[in-house]
Amino acid sequence: MDFEDDYTHSACRNTYQSFNGMDRDYGPGSYGGMDRDYGHGSYGGQRSMDSYLNQSYGMDNHSGGGGGSRFGPYESYDSRSSLGGRDLYRSGYGFNEPEQSRFGGSYGGRFESSYRNSLDSFGGRNQGGSSWEAPYSRSKLRPGFMEDRGRENYSSYSSFSSPHMKPAPVGSRGRGTPAYPESTFGSRNYDAFGGPSTGRGRGRGHMSDFGSIHRPGIVVDYQNKPTNVTVAAARGIKRKMIQPFNKPGGTFIKKPKLAKPVEKMSLSKSPTKTDPKNEEEEKRRIEARREKQRRRREKNSEKYGDGYRMAFTCSFCKFRTFEEKDIELHLESASHQETLDHIQKQTKFDKVVMEFLHECMVNKFKKTSIRKQQTNNQTEAVKIIEKDVMEGVTADDHMMKVETVHCSACSVYIPALHSSVQQHLKSPDHIKGKQAYKEQIKRESVLTATSILNNPIVKARYERFIKGENPFEIQDHSQDQQIEGDEEEEEKIDEPVEEEEEEEEEEEEVGEVEEAEEVGEGGGVEGVGDTEEGGDVEGEGEVGAVGEGEGEGEGVGEVEEEEAKEEPVGFSVDQAEEN
């Protein structure tokens, strides 16, 4: 029979003859006679004929749905060898040409199938059954693919009578080396209509489902295959659902982990009074903080003597001087008010609070002035300290005392010469450092203000200040002496404490700030610390002034230090509670 006969007139007759046992070979899969072995015996009979007629002439189920015509024509594994050079019974998805078989003829057959567009709607190349890498296709399972009861069209199980007749999978791993055992997931290669797998094809483009192509031939309906397919689908669904289910679970696990430390913290705060372990930890923390403050005082004393405690300071502006006039001018200056405004803006403090903070600085200045008056009479001690300063210096060392100017912004000492100071003022380093130091002062002033207000002693005084009383008035001499020492040391330590907080974050910056504060006063020497708004501290005077301060410190300074040692306890406790 000629292959060029009309399709609709010859297909049924040819197939009918083949079913009657005639040993004929008609191209499309060589369904020619009953001598073909399909693995499960021969297939034929009236039912197959009816299925064929429904498929060939009715064409009522060409979308790949369920029913008796769900499966495409069946071909044996080696049927390709019996095909002719040109087969009109094969669709446009041609596998009968060697070059297409070798390079994976996906689309691109010489004849276009009328059902190509409808088949493409079922999904991508991987879903339609390409020979692309197996894991990629399995990982891209689609919900629509799993929910369709006509999914047998997509499964290679539905296209073969036995697993041994399935084509060898080909993917990125090479021929015959599937990524997963095909017995587990089922090969999703749909090069099922003749010969081994067709290779890589054209990449990851769309590819239609060959199982749904309607061609003349025997339609084999495997009734038992959907169960296996659904098992594979169930596996895929389960694997798919586990991943998104675990993600919320993972976050759930994290939440209790985050909540547990919070509970511990809350428990550790409440039973602090009763639990001895927590009390011991709190005591250790307080002792460690006190020890740190004590070491800082000792270091400053070694560097500059106790005179650094005789300086007038503004904790907010990091201003330090040994002259009363300078501190008075500073407390009334625009730079000091600007710092207070910045604190109020950042902390949203009330105006009354800002007035109280300013009064704290004024009171601190007054107490320092009183302390200096009490120590002015100790001149002999000053001479002794002065000797110690120049101890070991001989003429061969070519050393002498000179006046210097200390720049806190740059942390350098400049000779007290007009030319040297002017040169430094115009230097790029100073211009840059001046702005950076000003911003640093603003940042630290906020921390200082909050740390002062968190002190329980200051809180009590603030309550009195709100009531209109004088919070700094001496009520009980013994108590007030301790309170005054506490507050003074607290406000002096406000800077170190604040630096302690920043030490945990920026240790280097803290060191510079601390040194700038303390060295500034040492370099301030006997007396003039005119601080310009630019951040320049002109500490004019002789180094002997440091000795003078040190001598004074030996007398009352020791008493004040004893008082100061008690103060950090209250402050540290409060700070520890804060942390």
Curated annotation (Swiss-Prot):
N6-acetyllysine modification sites are 247
| Record carries keyword Phosphoprotein | yes
Positions carrying Phosphothreonine are: 251
User: What are its GO cellular component terms?
Assistant: DBIRD complex; nuclear matrix; nucleus
Q: What is its main location?
A: nucleus
Pfam families the UniProt entry points to: AKAP95
The record's keywords, sorted A to Z, are: Acetylation, Activator, DNA-binding, Isopeptide bond, Metal-binding, Methylation, mRNA processing, mRNA splicing, Nucleus, Phosphoprotein, Repeat, Transcription, Transcription regulation, Ubl conjugation, Zinc, Zinc-finger
Q: Where in the cell is it found?
A: Nucleus matrix
Native species of this protein? Bos taurus (Bovine)
Q: What are the start and end residues of every segment in region (Disordered)?
A: 154-194, 248-302, 470-579
Q: What does this protein do?
A: Core component of the DBIRD complex, a multiprotein complex that acts at the interface between core mRNP particles and RNA polymerase II (RNAPII) and integrates transcript elongation with the regulation of alternative splicing: the DBIRD complex affects local transcript elongation rates and alternative splicing of a large set of exons embedded in (A + T)-rich DNA regions. May play a role in neuronal differentiation and is able to bind DNA and activate expression in vitro.
**Family under the similarity heading:** Belongs to the AKAP95 family.
Gene name in the database record: ZNF326
| Signal sequence region | none
Superkingdom of origin organism: Eukaryota
Q: Which InterPro entries match?
A: AKAP95, ZF_C2H2_AKAP95
What is the recorded name of this protein? Answer: DBIRD complex subunit ZNF326
Instruction: Name one process (GO BP) from the record.
Output: regulation of RNA splicing
Q: Which residues carry this modification: Omega-N-methylarginine?
A: 173, 235
The cross-link described as Glycyl lysine isopeptide (Lys-Gly) (interchain with G-Cter in SUMO2) comes at: 140, 240, 247, 254, 264, 401, 459, 467
Q: Where is the composition biased (Basic and acidic residues)?
A: 272-290
Tell whether Protease is among the UniProt keywords: no
Q: Where are the zinc fingers (C2H2 AKAP95-type)?
A: 314-336, 407-430
Map motif Bipartite nuclear localization signal onto the chain. 238-260
| Feature: compositional bias, Acidic residues | 483-520, 529-541, 549-565
This entry's Gene Ontology molecular function terms read: DNA binding; RNA polymerase II complex binding; zinc ion binding
